[in-house]
């Protein structure tokens, strides 16, 4: 892995080396921030397009091959083959889809159809592409900024200011009372889907303070103890670093008061209910009474990982 990290560093710092990598790397395609997917059996995959395929397709659109330099670096293989992402929003979407035999799919929808390998790359890709689209001018001079070839920064050549892509810290917390876990949903969620509580860190807050505030704000509960679990990049609404935590509330103080400005609903769920939900596919399932069965975020999402950790903790706890 050291060789991979060193190689990626070189690509970000040296446009000449990065240009060579573009001529031998592969590309993930987007159209107005929607990734290109192909259905293979029952799964959806994000195909890697070779530079030869890219040049051939651009030729059919009578586009200059230099358009490839609009791509952004998003990673590389263990063998140091670079991965890039390129948004072709200026070209006719249906023609590209027909040419490459796939579909551009809105990323939120795509997340429920992808495996764990493609999702992080597409997440990083969309976040970077969006950042470049919204930071084309210097906030101080109003003059155009220029990206380096890898897309790891933009420079205002009028005053030398360098802009780097940023992420907003967000805490995502799975609350438990010892025997149940608390899940919630926003009105924008797909029908029946519940997840852990989440919210942005305020300026000046510690991680612990954010967890306590968010739990109090959203469901009216006081956190007794908490601990860090893991982190994950998340491209919505712009680019966030999801900091996953577990939190415990006192079993005697579990009455939920839902903040309707933040959530549509929240509730306590038993281990049995969670186990059933983990066995369902991540998609809406309407029941005979018109309601929707509980289902959870996809396996690679950090909310799902938090829930899986809680299940393991319950299994290892004494009865």
Regions found by a protein language model. Give the residues of each.
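Cys/His-rich short segments
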Residues: 123-174
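Surface-exposed, charge/polar-rich loops and edge strands
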Residues: 205-206
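Active-site-adjacent beta-strand/loop module that shapes the phosphate/pyrophosphate-binding cleft
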Residues: 232-257
């Amino acid at each position: 892995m050291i060789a991979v990290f060193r190689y990626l560093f070189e690509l970000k710092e040296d446009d000449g080396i990065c240009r060579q990598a573009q001529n031998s790397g592969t590309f993930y395609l987007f159209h107005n921030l929607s990734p290109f997917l192909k259905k293979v059996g029952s799964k959806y995959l994000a195909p890697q397009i070779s530079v030869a395929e890219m040049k051939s397709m651009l030729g059919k659109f009578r586009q200059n091959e230099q358009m490839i330099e609009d791509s952004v670096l998003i990673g590389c293989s263990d063998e140091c083959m670079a991965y890039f992402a390129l948004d072709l929003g200026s070209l006719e979407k249906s023609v590209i889809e027909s040419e490459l035999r796939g579909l551009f799919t809105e990323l939120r929808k795509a997340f429920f159809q992808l495996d764990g390998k493609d999702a992080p790359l597409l997440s990083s890709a969309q976040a970077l592409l969006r950042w470049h689209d919204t930071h084309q001018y210097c906030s101080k001079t109003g003059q155009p900024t220029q990206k380096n070839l890898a897309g790891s920064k933009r420079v205002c050549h009028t005053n030398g200011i360098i802009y780097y892509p940023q992420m907003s810290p967000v805490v995502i917390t799975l609350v438990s009372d010892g025997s149940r876990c608390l899940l919630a949903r926003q009105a924008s969620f797909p029908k029946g889907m519940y997840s852990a509580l989440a919210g942005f860190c305020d300026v000046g807050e510690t991680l612990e303070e954010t967890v306590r505030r968010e739990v109090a704000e959203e469901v009216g509960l006081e956190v007794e103890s908490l601990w860090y679990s893991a982190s994950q990049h998340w491209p919505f609404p712009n680019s966030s670093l999801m900091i996953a935590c577990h939190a415990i509330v006192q079993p005697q103080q579990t009455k939920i008061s839902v903040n309707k400005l933040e959530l549509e609903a929240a509730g306590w769920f038993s281990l049995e209910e969670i186990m059933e939900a983990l066995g369902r596919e991540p998609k809406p399932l309407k029941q005979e009474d018109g309601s929707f069965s509980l289902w959870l975020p996809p396996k690679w999402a950090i909310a799902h990982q938090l829930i899986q950790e809680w299940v393991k903790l319950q299994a290892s706890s004494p009865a």
